[in-house]
A protein has these predicted regions:
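Sec-dependent bacterial lipoprotein signal peptides
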Residues: 1-15
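Extracytoplasmic copper-binding redox domains, predominantly the cupredoxin/blue-copper superfamily
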Residues: 17-255
Length: 255
């Protein structure tokens, strides 16, 4: 009789402990189920613009020729895109608001950013995307490619894409600048994804120009980042409805 009572008491204690252990899991589930904070509204009547030109100071290196003969599906000539300069203007510089937005939050666009593979090159060579936004990857070549991001702060993945296959859709959850992407099938194929938390970014075109629209008035740090030449930062203050020009230059060696 005594043994039965003790056994019953032991079961009651175990049941009570189990209930206590379950409580943190329920609390955690409730926290995970909470919706993301709403995007911070911006008054469109007050937004400002920052634009400018990025220059290369010095003698630009000649683009290296790429030998693509290992794959008959890669036709034509190809040149390295690590430093593209035309008339002193520097292309493929990622420009973004690095600091000054405070605790503002922004919704990722629903429309995807397209990354294409054509002529056994990635297009574009430098791409900007918001965290959580879809990147749609296409293959317009008559050969198989292998898309392989090698991030520091995001999840690494490696996926083959045969010709004429459906687009691959991916996203990156964390902010990361100059995230390298390569193709395991074609070692010369390289590009860079830039993942940011706000829509305030741009990539310089072949004339070195960029434009960032829709900024709320304030004090900001604008970062200019190049895959080989490094990063340059500038402070800028924009008033309501103001358009401010912020130019930048890079020297060989990232000076």
């Amino acid at each position: 009789m005594v043994v039965s009572v003790l056994a019953l008491c032991g079961l009651m204690v175990l049941a009570a402990c189990s209930k206590k252990e379950e409580q943190p899991s329920n609390t955690m589930a409730e926290q995970q189920a909470q919706p993301a904070p709403a995007a911070t509204p911006i008054d469109p009547a007050t937004v400002a613009t920052v634009n400018g030109t990025v220059k290369f100071d010095g003698t630009a290196p000649k683009p290296a020729k790429i030998d693509m003969s290992q794959d008959p599906g890669c036709k034509g000539t190809n040149e390295a895109e690590n430093i593209i300069v035309s008339g002193g203007d520097l292309a493929n510089v990622f420009v973004y608001v690095k600091d000054g937005l405070g605790n503002r939050t922004f919704d990722a666009p629903k429309d995807p950013i397209v990354l294409d593979q054509k002529g056994c090159q990635y297009h574009p060579h430098v791409l900007g995307v918001m965290a959580g936004q879809t990147v749609q990857i296409k293959n317009d070549d008559p050969t198989t490619h292998n898309i392989h991001p090698t991030p520091k702060d995001n999840r690494e993945w490696n996926e083959s894409q045969p010709p004429s296959s459906p687009a691959i859709e991916k996203n990156f959850a964390r902010e990361e600048i100059m995230l390298p992407v390569k193709c395991n099938q074609h070692p010369w194929m390289k590009m860079y994804v830039n993942v940011v938390k706000s829509p305030f970014y741009a990539v310089t075109d072949k004339t070195g120009k960029y434009e960032i629209k829709g900024l709320p008035p304030g004090d900001y740090t604008i970062a200019f980042v190049h895959e080989k030449l490094g990063e340059q930062d500038q402070k800028v203050t924009v008033a309501a409805k103001e358009t401010k020009t912020v130019d930048q230059s890079f020297k060989a060696g990232g000076e």
